[in-house]
Amino acid sequence: ANSGYGDSMNHGLEMARGKYVGILESDDFMAPDALEKLVSAADSNNADFAKANFDFYWSKPEERRSLHEMFRPRDCGKPVHPSDTTQFFKQKPSIWSAVYRRDFLERNGITFLPTPGASFQDTSFAFKVIACADKAIYLHDAVLSYRQDNENSSVNSSAKVFCVNTEYAEIERWIREDYARDHASDD
């Protein structure tokens, strides 16, 4: 039975055994060297995660791509503390154009909200990653093609437009309960 995106992702995180975790959704595709670039950048900078730009991709009526440039060249190639600027909290979550150190996710209890039938479940995951990371590295290269013409995609369902509210409620709960508790001595 399909228990939903968040629950499925959490099962994947529980089963993961490698140093890094990457996410690829079924209707998208990665550049052949995407994981090599992301892991190399994360490893060489001892980063909690490495994240890159991506392309919007259409296959109909003809194939075309458009770079979604979240990170400008000046922001790339050097380690940053992602929560030092609000810029990164405002970006499209795009959790699939990144790799995350598995021990970082586990240490911070970062998982997905397991709400069956929901959408936007990458929203709270991405927020928690940015808030908890001590070091990130951004790449200018587009490493993933994010398909825009899948009519069955949950982001194209008007019935699911309010699901993002559940994600924002989870962010608020997490800040109040988990983040505040775990970072009380950071002042």
Regions found by a protein language model. Name each.
Residues 5, 9, 26-140, 144-161:
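Donor-binding/catalytic cores of nucleotide-activated saccharide
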Residues 1-16:
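Glycine-rich, basic loop-to-helix element that forms the pyrophosphate-binding segment
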Residues 166-187:
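C-terminal, non-catalytic tails of nucleotide-sugar-dependent glycosyltransferases
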